[in-house]
Curated annotation (Swiss-Prot):
Listed PANTHER family: NADH DEHYDROGENASE [UBIQUINONE] IRON-SULFUR PROTEIN 2, MITOCHONDRIAL (PTHR11993:SF10), NADH-UBIQUINONE OXIDOREDUCTASE 49 KDA SUBUNIT (PTHR11993)
Protein's UniProt keywords contain NADP: yes
Position of the signal peptide: none
Bilayer disposition of the protein: Peripheral membrane protein
Protein name (database record): NAD(P)H-quinone oxidoreductase subunit H, chloroplastic
BP terms from Gene Ontology: photosynthesis, light reaction
UniProt family annotation: Belongs to the complex I 49 kDa subunit family.
Catalytic function, reaction form: a plastoquinone + NADH + (n+1) H(+)(in) = a plastoquinol + NAD(+) + n H(+)(out); a plastoquinone + NADPH + (n+1) H(+)(in) = a plastoquinol + NADP(+) + n H(+)(out)
Main subcellular location of this protein, as a coarse class: plastid
Function recorded in the entry: NDH shuttles electrons from NAD(P)H:plastoquinone, via FMN and iron-sulfur (Fe-S) centers, to quinones in the photosynthetic chain and possibly in a chloroplast respiratory chain. The immediate electron acceptor for the enzyme in this species is believed to be plastoquinone. Couples the redox reaction to proton translocation, and thus conserves the redox energy in a proton gradient.
Subcellular location: Plastid, Chloroplast thylakoid membrane
EC number: 7.1.1.-
Length: 393
């Protein structure tokens, strides 16, 4: 009886675009030698919606509901970058109270994004239990968002020169209660996860990115800080009022999946510190720049005219974007989210180029997964933290 011949050919496997570990419609064409990854080719574009072209045919206020569909788990940051560009282009001042409200909302959104990264990341590597604990805290953040903005997701809260509405009565106390409670939740995560030997086996030394590689590939956010580069735009650019708070940049030296996990866990604790300081020191005053608003004035309005019902309402500010170009950026949960904006004396942007952190960070994936095991792809891809709505735009 002859023994069956062992095949030694390379095997090509398609992972995605409907794989639960892809976190969206990402497709990977993998070349395998047994369990070893020889090559990886990402296929993008399944969620492309032409967001940059849409911006060229909308005013900024008309475009705001669209931007929440880029990174739909951290929508406050896409709104912030959309209003920050025209504000700097037209030199519009933001009241101090509005700036504090923005920082509170941004940091709450950062925590919610990191929580929704941590839960599925743990599920990808085989730990299902933390997933449910993490959703418990995330629901509390969404309840705060709903009370302040009216929406749990896709908030449409930021406006040029401020925010859409002031914080409701009692919201600050509720948020302070959440901050005190959440710190115990983070301690629970660390007790449950960080020293778990099975978790450490799956992440320690997996997907290592050296500092030089991180800089050469243009990585940003936790991906860059986990590789030993202490770079955070909240410290570098000092936009909004981040320079008024005491907090530390979280970073690690190892550059592996464990380091990226530790950076994000540390960032959640630092965000709570900033929120507490902002809530305790929030000033009074207007929540928007009233000079931006334009009211329709009619000398003798008739109650039965078609336009009558619109007179008392605040219309959207429409102004020309001056003929110049500008790059503006914020530190989003996934990295540097930037907009390159060109105005041409029109109410519409002439060019609206989006720099999504997820796309830039994803580019290093083929290099990192080579010579790794097939099962490590889920760990590495999960530690990068991508949202395909932002990657494909």
């Amino acid at each position: 009886m002859t023994a069956p011949a062992t095949r030694k050919d390379l095997m090509i496997v398609n992972m995605g675009p409907h794989h639960p570990s892809m976190h969206g419609v990402l497709r990977l064409i993998l070349t395998l030698d047994g369990e070893d990854v020889i090559d990886c080719e990402p296929i993008l574009g399944y969620l492309h919606r032409g967001m940059e072209k849409i911006a060229e045919n909308r005013t900024i206020i008309q475009y705001l509901p669209y931007v929440t569909r880029w990174d739909y788990l951290a929508t406050m940051f896409t709104e912030a970058i959309t209003v920050n560009g025209p504000e700097r282009l037209s030199n519009i001042q933001v009241p101090k109270r509005a700036s504090y409200i923005r920082v509170i909302m941004l940091e709450l959104s950062r925590i919610a994004s990191h929580l929704l990264w941590l839960g599925p990341f743990m599920a990808d590597i085989g730990a299902q239990t933390p997933f449910f604990y993490i959703f418990r805290e995330r629901e509390l953040i969404y309840d705060l968002f709903e009370a302040a903005t009216g929406m749990r997701m896709m908030h449409n809260f930021f406006r040029i020169g401020g925010v859409a509405a002031d914080l409701p009565h009692g919201w600050i106390d509720k948020c302070l209660d959440f901050c005190n409670y959440f710190l115990t939740g983070v301690a629970e995560y660390q007790k449950l996860i960080t020293q778990n030997p099975i978790f450490l086996e799956r992440v320690e030394g997996i997907g290592t990115i050296r500092a030089e590689e991180a800089l050469n590939w243009g990585l940003s956010g936790p991906m860059l800080r986990a590789s030993g580069i202490e770079w955070d735009l909240r410290k570098i650019d000092q936009y909004e009022c981040y320079d008024e708070f005491a907090w530390e940049v979280q970073w690690q030296k190892e550059g592996d999946s464990l380091a990226r996990y530790l950076v994000r866990i540390g960032e959640m604790e630092e965000s709570i510190k900033m929120i507490q300081q902002a809530l305790e020191g929030i000033p009074g005053g207007p929540y928007e720049n009233l000079e931006i608003r334009r009211f329709d004035r009619v000398k003798h309005p008739q109650w039965n005219d078609f336009e009558y019902r619109f007179i008392a309402k605040k219309t959207s500010p429409i102004f020309e974007l001056s003929k110049q170009e500008l790059y503006v950026r914020v530190e989003a949960p996934k990295g540097e989210l930037g907009i390159f904006l060109i105005g041409d004396q029109s109410v519409f942007p002439w060019r609206w180029k989006i720099r999504p952190p997820g796309l830039i960070n994803l580019q290093i994936l083929p290099q990192v997964v080579k010579r790794m095991k097939l099962a490590d792809i889920m760990t590495i891809l999960g530690s990068i933290d991508i949202i395909m709505g932002e990657v494909d735009r």
